Amino acid sequence: MDNNTKLQKLYEQLAATGSEKELDAMLDENMAGAGSPLTVTITGLIVAATTGFDWCPTGACTYSCRV
């Protein structure tokens, strides 16, 4: 599954927790860069809001977090 598909599934899971505008703002503000792996660009807020995924906060771009 590519990063865009993962992000779309995550977005769908979060759709019930906030408005589309709030989710768009949250995701836009927390992207570290287009070339970064998705698991490194999502912040801890999404970590707390999701299950089944091991997301790393932007500040925790470490080897153990990326693997």
From Swiss-Prot:
Upper classification of the source organism reads: Bacteria, Bacillati, Bacillota, Clostridia, Eubacteriales
Q: Which residues carry this modification: 2,3-didehydrobutyrine?
A: T39, T43
Crosslink feature (Beta-methyllanthionine (Thr-Cys)) location? T50-C56, T58-C61, T62-C65
The propeptide segment or segments lie at 1-34
Q: Which GO terms describe its cellular component?
A: extracellular region
Q: Which gene encodes it?
A: FlvA2.b
Q: Which GO terms describe its molecular function?
A: signaling receptor binding
The role this protein plays is: Lanthionine-containing peptide antibiotic (lantibiotic) only active on Gram-positive bacteria in synergy with Flvalpha.a. Is not active in absence of Flvalpha.a, which is encoded by the same operon than Flvbeta.b. The bactericidal activity of lantibiotics is based on depolarization of energized bacterial cytoplasmic membranes, initiated by the formation of aqueous transmembrane pores.
> A GO term (biological process) for this protein?
defense response to bacterium
NCBIfam families in the record: lant_II_LchA2
Modification type 2,3-didehydroalanine (Ser): residues: S36
**What PTM annotation applies here?**
Contains DL-beta-methyllanthionine, when coepressed in E.coli with the flavecin synthetase FlvM2.
What is the name listed in the Swiss-Prot or TrEMBL entry for this protein? Lantibiotic Flvbeta.b
